[in-house]
Amino acid sequence: MQLYSSESESDDSQYWVDWFLGLKGNEFFCEVDEDFIQDRFNLTGLSHEVPHYSQSLDLILDVLDPDLPEEVQDEVEASARHLYGLIHARYILTAQGLYKMLEKYKKCDFGHCPRVLCNGQPMLPVGLSDIAHTKSVKLYCPRCEDVYTPKSQRHASIDGAYFGTSFPHMLFQVYPELAVPKSQERYIPRIFGFKVHSYSATFKKQDVYKEKQKKRLQGAEAESKNKLAIT
């Protein structure tokens, strides 16, 4: 039995992960190494979050008992998709996972920033929460440092927890050479050539806040380095 054969046009020998990644709307996901999935340490705590956990894991690994009762097949398939997403969030923080997502980033698989002044900057998927069923996935632009809703509804409906809140920032920590200069350009509303005062005041407040945040982060980084030096 193959629970996913009804939506797949390929032959019966197709692996579940290949089938899942081939579904429209799943282009943001990368392939999680089977060794990572089989290491139960990497799955710690997930059994409490996923119904039919054992059967779902077996389905992902293509070792599911073919005699699974028909009345639970749909539930197991849905749980397998959810489980893969949660595993994916952990995997893309590993060296192998970061590299695979880096390759997709280089190919602009996640799209370009819609902000005109970012000049087509490639984006990265990010979650606004690490808790499943809370927020859908967003796209993070490293140039303007803002997040956007994916254009496609297929992508916009993906759970943000499948990518997590740390992924894009971890990627640039591991690959600092990919860091892009932050956008300093800002559209300024004008009427007959004069800046609109209310917007100018807002921009000034934003700049002050941004500078305070930058100093706070620099201070925290320096403190962290001092602690490491002492130890």
UniProtKB/Swiss-Prot annotation:
GO biological process: negative regulation of transcription by RNA polymerase II; positive regulation of pericentric heterochromatin formation; positive regulation of silent mating-type cassette heterochromatin formation; protein phosphorylation; regulation of transcription by RNA polymerase III; signal transduction
InterPro entries listed in its UniProt record: Casein_kin_II_reg-sub_N, Casein_kinase_II_beta-like, Casein_kinase_II_reg-sub
Keywords (A to Z) from UniProt: Phosphoprotein
Annotated function: Regulatory subunit of casein kinase II/CK2. As part of the kinase complex regulates the basal catalytic activity of the alpha subunit a constitutively active serine/threonine-protein kinase that phosphorylates a large number of substrates containing acidic residues C-terminal to the phosphorylated serine or threonine.
Classification via Pfam families: CK_II_beta (PF01214)
Keyword Translocase: no
Subunit composition and interactions: Tetramer composed of two alpha chains, one beta chain and one beta' chain.
PTM text: Phosphorylated by alpha subunit.
PROSITE patterns given in the database record: CK2_BETA (PS01101)
Gene Ontology terms: cellular component: cytoplasm; mitotic spindle pole body; nucleus; protein kinase CK2 complex; UTP-C complex
Protein name per Swiss-Prot or TrEMBL: Casein kinase II subunit beta
A single GO molecular function term of this UniProt record: protein serine/threonine kinase activator activity
Family in the record: Belongs to the casein kinase 2 subunit beta family.
